[in-house]
Regions:
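Extended recognition/assembly regions associated with phosphoester-bond processing machinery
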Residues: 1-181
Length: 181
């Protein structure tokens, strides 16, 4: 059985749960790179999660995958290295799911945020939707908005892949998210 059934978490020590961990996962380019090549990065994240946090926010910040389609092209039709999409999908699972599972085992509040990249916005969105179905106990933001905002305590953190240049990025944040700003 491939799907993870929803489960309740039991935190080890509620006294430790007083902070938020923001996990940024930008430009992994799975398909060009493998989960194994990122094992030190993944292990560092898993070790950090052992500290337990009140909130964990996992940000898929674009270009999780190297290509967006079976023709090994990006969203702008740029041909990249040969990429096998089914293998890339499995590699992404090997990298991302242990992080989600560890976060769920050690934190009462886990959120996943998808942002569009310039290589893979469609397949990464589909992967985010897959994670939304597989892990319903997490909060998910899978909207296709280019700019996202995560509020932690009284702090607003703005998230984007960064490939779309905006002259007035600060003004854009304030306009799109006036309450948070």
């Amino acid at each position: 059985e491939q799907y993870t059934k929803p489960f309740d978490i039991e935190c080890i020590d509620d006294d430790k749960l007083d902070s938020t961990l923001l996990i940024n996962l930008p430009d992994l380019h799975i398909g060009y790179n493998t989960a194994d090549e990122y094992s030190k990065y993944q292990n560092g994240i898993l070790t950090t999660l052992e500290n337990q946090y009140e909130n964990v926010v996992i940000c898929l910040l674009g270009d999780l995958f190297h290509a967006d389609n079976f023709q090994s092209k990006t969203i702008h039709e740029t041909r990249v290295n040969d990429t096998h999409i089914p293998n890339s999908w499995e590699e992404a699972i090997l990298f991302v799911e242990p992080i989600i599972q560890k976060a769920l085992a050690t934190s009462p509040n886990v959120k996943l945020v998808y942002t569009r990249g310039n290589h893979d916005e469609t397949i990464s969105w589909a992967f985010s939707k897959y994670l939304e179905v597989k892990y319903p106990q997490c909060e998910h933001d899978v909207s296709i908005d280019q700019l996202k905002c995560v509020t932690i305590d009284k702090n607003a953190i703005f998230l984007t892949h960064g490939h779309v240049k905006k002259k007035n990025f600060v003004q854009l944040c304030a306009t799109l998210y006036p309450q948070e700003w």
